[in-house]
Structures are given as C-alpha cells and as structure tokens.
Swiss-Prot record:
It is found in: Cell membrane. This is Protease HtpX homolog. InterPro entries: HtpX_protease, Pept_M48_protease_HtpX, Peptidase_M48. GO terms for cellular component: plasma membrane. The active site is at 136. It comes from Mycobacterium leprae (strain TN). Its EC number is 3.4.24.-. The chain crosses the membrane at residues 10-30, 33-53, 145-165, 181-201. The lineage of its organism: Bacteria, Bacillati, Actinomycetota, Actinomycetes, Mycobacteriales.
Length: 287
C-alpha cells in the first residue's frame, strides 16, 4: 500500500508559506512584541491539541473503549487493514449515538484511536463498514492530524493579530493611526483568508483519505455506497449543534450536522458528498 507523505508535505509547505505571509503582513502593524505573544498563544494551544487530539475528540463524542468480544467485526476488519498496511493496531471505541458517523484521531499510528457510532454500525453492511474504517485509518497513516494542527496554529496567530488590529483601531493604540481602513481590512480579511486555507486543506484531506482508503480496501464502490447511507442518515439523525461537537466535526467521515443548520455550515470542512462519490466511481471506471 502506498500512502501520500509527499502530497501532505507539499500541502503543509504551501500552508506555511501562505499563512506565514499573512502573519507577517498583519504583524507588521504592531511590531515584534505583539507578533511574538500572538504566536506563543496560538502555537501553545495547538501543540496541546496535537498531543491530546484523541482525548478531546473521544470525550466530545462520549466514546467508550470496546473489546474484541464486544465488537468482533470491527476488530477483525481493523486488524486486517492495519496488518495489510504494516501499521500497529489502533485502539477502538464506540460512541452511543444514533448519528451515523466515524472518525480517527491520534498524532501518529502508535497513538491512534478509531471510533464508530452505534448509528453507523446499524446502517452499514460489513463491506461498507470496511470501506469506512479504511478511510479513517488512512487519515492516521497520512498524518492528517499534524496538518490540521499546523493549520490551526497558523490560523490562530492570524486571528489573534486581527483581533488586536480591531481592538487597536477602536482605541487608537496602533502606530498606523493614519490609515484606519488598513486596520479594518486586516481585521476582517485576515481570519477569512485563514479560514479559506484551512477549509481547502481539510477538503483535500478528505479526498485523499477517500482515495487512500479505497486503495487499502480495494473497494471504492463500497465507500461510495457507505457515504450515500451516511449522508441520508445524518439528515435523519444529526449530531446536536453544540460547539464542543462542532470543534471535532472536521474529524468525522461526513459533516455530522444537518444541512441547513447554521453551525453545520459554519464549521463544515467536508467536500460535497456527491463530489466524493463521483471521484470514487471514477477510480473504478479508470481501472
């Protein structure tokens, strides 16, 4: 099985360059001291998130560890996929919710955890479940948690500096008092630009995990079928639109909120299900 570390490194590099440029531009308003403290806070938060990503996500979903006796099919599938990829066996969890979804978390394969909801276990057959688990394991093998935290750290710096710009513009404490429009522009467009980059990277991660997972299982159409069921299931039984759950939504295999929910749109980091299905079907057609 061939993963895509080069593609992930390229995305990380582009992300660093683009967001770092924004940081330099925004930080130039205040000088080195403000830039230093904004960077320190944002990086600190995301380093903590990186090392505790599994705990944060599992806690938000009220997930419980399961044994092989409790979830024999899930264990068998994950063990087969991990063995085929020459990777260690992750910890397995189940979240007792009707919302059909799954996610993987952990900073590397040795610290990985995979969680399925009871809802997804009820609606998928074994072939589809295998495809979903292959997708989730691919996120771990592709080091997507690292990319998310890099994006989060840089976006956090930009947002913090933009907030400073707004505050300074309000109270007139910036040395750029001659151009208040520049402050307004920076405070508004900085966070928007950071969000756009984060969403682009996140959507790219989902496409990549679809492809890698389909290659791991050898069954792209099973994942396409699973995505159809999950999409319909989410509309019938979405997760409640709570901020704690929204902060972990990017880890899910599909947007866990009902289409049209304000919070679902605000925190959506997933490409359209139809596009993902189309790409998977193209993989089969191109064989």
């Amino acid at each position: 099985m061939t993963w895509h570390p080069q593609a992930n490194r390229l995305k990380t590099f582009v992300l660093l360059v683009g967001m770092s440029t924004l940081i330099v531009v925004v930080g130039a308003i205040f000088g080195r001291t403000a830039l230093f403290f904004a960077t320190l806070v944002a990086v600190g938060i995301n380093v903590y998130t990186y090392y505790n990503s599994d705990k944060l996500a599992l806690r938000a979903m009220h997930a419980q560890p399961v044994s092989e006796v409790q979830a024999p099919v899930m264990y068998r599938i994950v063990r087969e996929l991990a063995t085929g990829a020459h990777q260690p066996m992750p910890r397995l969890y189940i979240s007792d919710t009707n919302a059909p979804n799954a996610f993987a978390t952990g900073r590397n394969p040795r610290n990985a955890a995979v969680c399925c909801t009871t809802g997804i276990l009820e609606i998928l057959n074994e072939r589809e479940l295998r495809a979903v688990l292959g997708h989730e394991l691919s996120h771990v093998y592709n080091r997507d948690i690292l990319i998310s935290c890099v994006a989060g750290a840089l976006a956090g710096v930009i947002t913090a500096l933009a907030n400073m710009a707004m505050w300074a513009g309000t109270f007139g404490t910036t040395r750029d008092e001659e151009n208040p429009f520049a402050l307004l522009l920076v405070s508004l467009l900085g966070p928007i630009a950071a969000t756009v980059v984060r969403l682009a990277v996140s959507r790219s991660r989902e496409y990549q995990a679809d492809e890698s997972g389909a290659m791991l299982t050898g069954d792209p159409l099973a994942l396409a079928s699973a995505l159809r069921k999950i999409s319909s299931g989410v509309q019938a039984a979405p997760l409640p639109p709570e901020p704690q759950l929204a902060s972990q939504a990017h880890l899910m295999i599909a947007n866990p909120f009902r289409v049209g929910d304000r919070i679902g749109s605000l925190f959506s980091t997933h490409p359209p299900i139809e596009d993902r299905i189309r790409r998977l079907e193209t993989m089969v057609a191109g064989r």
